Amino acid sequence: MSRDALIVGLNTYTYLRKLNAPAEDAEAIARCLEQQGEFRVWRLPEAIENSKPRVGKTLHLTLPELQRALVQLFKPSERQIPDTALFYFSGHGIRYDAGIQEGYLATSDVNPDQGFCGLSLRWLRQLLKESPVRQQIIWLDCCHSGELLNFDEADPGDQGKGRDRCFIAASRASQVAYEEMGSAHSVLTKALLGGLDPKRLPDRWIDNLVLTDFINQALRVCL
């Protein structure tokens, strides 16, 4: 079974407050997927340290770069379609109201005062609908990421060929994601890493249902 993952962690923004946790959170997820999930992982923004790739703490990522990477992940044209495609994003989320409220994943080049907010979650939903990848996993660790949970999982253009989609978000659309004081990771990423730990269930395969149940319980304790 082939598994591909795009892992994004953005600390650095031109017009928004810089963040501390996303790059470290993303790198921890990337290593976990590589070492325990047998995923082929792409990191953004990518830095090379000691001849190895890692999520860059001070690097920028533009909207076109993120869009190209997502299209390559979910609609690959020059390589075999993976059985599973996973997208993890940690960074700022934006809800912008220009007569119609819409949610965005903020890339480093966003400027909300000028109406430029980053990757539209509606665009992402449409990409997932059109994707031939059978198992699609999206983990969003940002404020307002709950906007994506309005996604209509039924794909009317592909009846009879169901998709297995799993969405895990750090917050509801009206809430702000937060970091747990004294922890090396955000609340959601800490729960993800805990749920993916093979030592927790040594005799059981960790699938989406098992992981989601663990995260729901972990977040309930934190609230």
What are these regions (language model features)?
Residues 15-20, 55-58, 113:
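Second-shell loop/turn segments in exported
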Residues 2, 58-151, 184, 203-204, ...:
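Caspase-like (clan CD) cysteine peptidase catalytic core
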Residues 9, 19, 26, 117-118, ...:
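Active-site-proximal C-terminal subdomain of hydrolase catalytic domains
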Residues 1-18:
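Short glycine-rich His-centered loop
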Residues 3, 39, 165:
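Short, conserved active-site loop motifs that form the nucleotide-linked donor/cofactor pocket
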Residues 1, 34-35, 95-99, 158-161:
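Short glycine/proline-enriched loop/turn "hinge" motifs that connect secondary-structure elements
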Residues 26, 31-83:
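Functional beta-strand-loop-alpha-helix junction segments that form "active/interaction loops"
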Residues 8-11, 44-48, 88-92, 108, ...:
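Active-site-proximal beta-strand/loop segments in catalytic clefts of secreted hydrolases
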